[in-house]
Amino acid sequence: MTDFCIIGKPIAMIDAAEKTTGSGRYTDDLSLPGMLVGKILHSPYPHARIKNIDGSRAERLDGVVAVVVGKDAPNPYGILPVGHDEHALALDKVRYVGDNVACVVAVTEAIAEKALELIDVNYEILPAYFDPEESMKAQADLIHDNKPNNVEKDYHHVFGDPKKGFADADEIDERRFIANEVTHAAMEPHSTLASFEIDPQTGNAGRLTVWSSTQVPYYLQHKLSLVLEMPMSQIRVIKPLVGGGFGGKSEVIPLEIIAAIAARKAQAPVKITYTREEVFWAHRGRPRTIIDLKTGVKHDGRITAVKARVVQDGGAYCSYGVVTILYSGALLGALYDIPNIQFDGYRVLTNKPACGAMRGHGTVNVRFAFESQLDELAAKIGMDPAEIRRRNLLQPPCITVNGLRVQSYGLPECIEKTVERSGWKERKGKLAKGRGLGIACSHYVSGAANSIIRSDMPHSTVNVKIDRDGGVVIYTGASEIGQGSDTMTAQIAAEVLGCSLRRVKVIAADTDLTPIDIGSYSSRVTFMAGNATLRAAEEVKKLIAAAAAKKMGCEVDELVFRDDVVMRSSGVIAEGLSGQNRPGRDGRERPSPHGTFSPQQAQQASVSGHVEGQILRGSLQQKRKEEGPKDSMTFEEAVVAAIDFHGALTGTGSYAPPPEARGGKHKGAGVGPSPAYSYSAQVAEVSVDEDTGEVTVHKVWAAHDCGRALNPVSVEGQIIGSVWMGMGQALTEEMVWKDGLLMNPGMLEYRSPSAIESPEVEAIIVESVDPEGPFGAKECSEGSLAATIPAIANAIYDAVGVRLREAPFTPERVLTALRAKKNGKALNLTEGVDPTSPVRFREHGGALCYKGKGPERHALDRSRCGTSSVPGGAD
């Protein structure tokens, strides 16, 4: 069925009103009686051993209720089962400037901040490692004693025969690419409110409730249980409105556990909200990545082999690191047909904040390198960049060389649409000097086929309940974080049930009320929670259909649910009036199964609250019993009949990816497989000022294969948002470090593009209709981002003839490349570029809550190792 009532229609988000009017409540808006404020003391050193912590002076300050330190919750945790290397508050060591040392709980924020100054910490300063390739050489003073050479994890995969593939190649290109660290820059800072039920007789802490701006309520509940040594059933996690996540809230952040520990110790509700600067220090963004890439092609453009060595600067803790490094290798496949791949990946520890998941998790940096190199190879063999991509398309359904199953594949159409809309054939290489076009492609998963927590449980479960008045309530654990997942689930349920969207209410992400969903990340919600919603709605629809069929004296398969009416698909109402409305036996207009409601019908079939539906229901039902079976019923009437026959109207649906979508058996095979993949192609038009090095993006044509667009306006918004975020990483965004200090910990210095700098984006929806997606839908919110960066890089080459292999493409880097071209020498990636030199960076490293000033805050070299014993931790 493709004649949808709600699916495929542009629909406003169901939570739009509360967000646009300011009536919506985010975590930091919440307050409880007797609530206290928590503030965190951070490490001033990148690497040091904690010899002693004394919070007694802080505890004596009026207004201070508690001081919390690492020994108050010594159990380690981590988002991955293989990476339990974090403590909410440091126990024996601090591993980066900004690491969490202690927390003060006080009646006001001002008192808490004053108390931080009174905590005495003695440190033994240790050598620190800031560059991942240098860190890999470490033999002593390791960041974690159980990680030799500071390597968190390394993987080595060979698929096919890469040696033969390179031997067969007519042209080979081998380059180093660097993509620097970036962060999410979500509007809402991380915030958590924790409250224990305190037994008034014993004073013991009982049940815990946590409100948090999280993408993963179930994982948060799980980790709180682990650290606090409490049963999960005694922990309730509620997700209020979330002001953006992009991956930055997709794991358990120390703040969330610290708030719970503090609430238990203070025996009162405690709220902790990061300052914007703290968000930057705790960001878990995209890691700096060094990619040594080698690709071989034939003269006909066919790729023969790819070899990638990827080194990621993971920071001080595991975070999502194992998954991140595996994605960077696994998703080299599933975009093009590559017969031979060698991948060597290293996730390396450094004395900087941990990096984690960010929009396009694991794929963006390697895709920048690959799509840039593919253009270089096209130039070597004299082939159009669009054509070389066409020559390497997959032939679905297929299994890639590394075991990824591909069923729906809209990349060919994406390429054709962008080439056509941009005038590629007519304009490429023919624009005015300093202006150019570039093309690139990308793809992404529609959720991971294998769960982080290894189990056989469904990845998503949804419950649907229908009340007597026809109101539909959806209970889902999926987190709405601004991407529109609540609207999506409401649309699917309304489409299946044939009811109006205004009947549907969504209750989401409350672990006491909603069934398990493993979270909003990896673009999994539409595919997985959407399928679960569809199945739950179909289950309850069967109950309604059985009752309606009995009332109408027909078979269940004769019924059609549409426009708030349950009707027979054949019979009196279809005779001679197809496509028209006609009177029923009671004199009212009835819709044809092929028609729509008139305004009069819409009023008659409206939701509860109308006099006829509420006050006169009994007499109307009695009248209809006397008249005999009808050809149609309002949705509300059918629901009442079903409740009379069956009792409560509830349905449950679950989804887990099928076994055939879960990948191969090699080490690390669990990361990369997905039930479906999205595909994108982009053409960017840019201009380059050769005097200043400034790059301006004028327009981006972005085509995205999303399976089926359940809500086109939402899909277009996601495509535009992905392009915008990709442009930021391409041109301006970069976490700048100097000896372990973050030089730009604020929105002004970090420089995300503003609305003024955002280019025109022509979003092009391509619908391949996936056989397993809900109504054919799949991912739409992340896959486009990875194509933007190389499309801009390739456009810069078309404009001024220089290849930029380090992102972002700042004016300094552009000018350095132009000088290298003018002087006829190869570009050194770091020559002439000091990322800390622009005046926008804070030489003092910001105003994070830690002790010590200037260069004495931490060891800048090994010769300055020693012991700090002054209150607050500075010599």
Where are the language model's segments positioned?
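Extended active-site and interfacial segments that coordinate phosphate-rich ligands
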Residues: 14-18, 117-130, 215-217, 222, ...
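Glycine-rich loop/linker segments at domain edges
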Residues: 9, 15-18, 149-192, 288-372, ...
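Intrinsic disorder/low-complexity segments
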Residues: 200-205, 567-629, 662, 827-875
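Catalytic phosphate/nucleotide-handling subdomain of diverse soluble enzymes
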Residues: 448, 453-514
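C-terminal catalytic domains of large/alpha subunits in multi-subunit enzymes
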Residues: 70-71, 229-234, 263-270, 299, ...
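Flexible, low-hydrophobicity surface segments
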Residues: 1-151, 172, 255
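Helix-loop-helix junctions that connect adjacent transmembrane helices in secondary transporters/permeases
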Residues: 141-228, 392-471, 743-757, 762-764
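Thiamine diphosphate
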Residues: 232, 245-267, 271-273, 485-492
